[in-house]
């Protein structure tokens, strides 16, 4: 039996991970869970899975959970705020931590889990985007596996198994193209929140759905792939693949290309990461090639979807520049979801911040500098409006 904590259990990845656990025939045991403020969802999880530890970022919500547990004679240990997240990420009795928190908030507990020598099933891409050098160094020092949960990175991970990284020639990251594939910049005026959330293939949370619409999600995945697979940015290629069947590919030095294909179901990479190194019986629909009429691939439009281009630029510059990129994007997406800015404003805000905070990138890459700069960038974006 493998014991785990899930950070961000009430979100899209977290809830799909619960489905994986339910179908694991007792081979996966949930010990700790965290959420931000979703009290009702957390109570249902406590009733069904009976985790020993529950953490809520919101202290008031943690109080509500504790009151519920006391009234119902639950022995659940309820923790709160970042201290609680860090504790649940580093519990002595767990084997692996699924980090499915959205945004920069996932960085600190992920590092705490690594220092406690817990393997990481990583769904929080921002952790590697802003601190890839720190995280991978810490993982190597503590002999910790970083197992990607993103479908694309899981595909690459599987395609690389049994092969030497030195034989890797190129990573080919596939992207669905999002809801606005084929559109030009002039077509992206007056885009509503609902338009941008309407992803054609994947069931995802609100923030990542907007990132997919701008192609920033793919940009963040490029930076993540650089750190996970020690691959130079010039050897990472993004291709638009609207069918979302080929989840990504690896080209080797001899020209051979190995791809991982499957249904567009996030439970597959979640299940693979949580059960690594074993493969378990499928809980999702399998791919039927008789129903696959075609597989097509296109070049991304970097002029229309500038966030992808900016992500390559930030990744190549390195240091603290990805922190600026990510912080500006997080703040801008939040404003767009609150209908305070237009869709195309997201693009302009990111580029503006990368230029404005250029001097900050001369500082050394430390956890303290990352956190400080992230706050500074987000405050600047919010104060703009």
Swiss-Prot record:
Keyword Metal-binding: yes
Pathway(s) of this molecule: Isoprenoid biosynthesis; isopentenyl diphosphate biosynthesis via DXP pathway; isopentenyl diphosphate from 1-deoxy-D-xylulose 5-phosphate: step 1/6
Enzyme Commission numbers on file: 1.1.1.267
Binding site for NADPH: 10-13, 124, 126, 205
Amino-acid positions noted as binding Mn(2+) in the UniProt annotation, renumbered to this chain: 150, 152, 221
Cofactor: Mg(2+); Mn(2+)
NCBIfam families to which the protein is assigned, alphabetical: Dxr, PRK12464.1
Function recorded in the entry: Catalyzes the NADPH-dependent rearrangement and reduction of 1-deoxy-D-xylulose-5-phosphate (DXP) to 2-C-methyl-D-erythritol 4-phosphate (MEP).
Family (UniProt): Belongs to the DXR family.
Full protein name: 1-deoxy-D-xylulose 5-phosphate reductoisomerase
Organism: Clostridium botulinum (strain Alaska E43 / Type E3)
